[in-house]
Regions:
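Flexible "arm" and connector segments at domain edges
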Residues: 1-105
Length: 105
């Protein structure tokens, strides 16, 4: 099994457990796929534990995904708020199945 790990993990493992095998990913497409897997892992950890600190891991992975995709997350975030709004009003929609696609950007 392999998965993306943070930069300092090999050193931390070597200090406590001994050997840590790892490799550096050079291929951007593979790195992007590993980041997507990591995002799923981190979201599942948050959903399982409900720990707010897990959100930091999610945000970190999202930041790296945006970097690889060469997109400005802040710009996209602000654009999405302008076009679709936020969640300030705490609205809940009731839709027949299947749910409508609304401004999917």
């Amino acid at each position: 099994m392999y998965k993306l790990i943070r930069d300092l993990i090999p050193e931390l493992i070597q200090q406590t457990e001994g050997i840590c095998n790892y490799a550096e990913v050079k291929n951007d497409e593979f790195y992007y796929a590993l980041l997507q897997d990591k995002l799923i892992e981190e979201v599942n950890e948050y959903l399982a534990t409900g720990e707010i600190t897990e959100l930091v891991d999610i945000i970190t992975v999202i930041k790296y995904i945006a970097d690889v995709a060469k997109v400005d997350l802040k710009e996209l975030y602000e654009e999405k708020l302008k076009t679709n709004g936020g969640f300030d009003k705490r609205l809940v929609g009731f839709f027949p199945d299947p749910q409508p696609e609304v401004n999917q950007k």
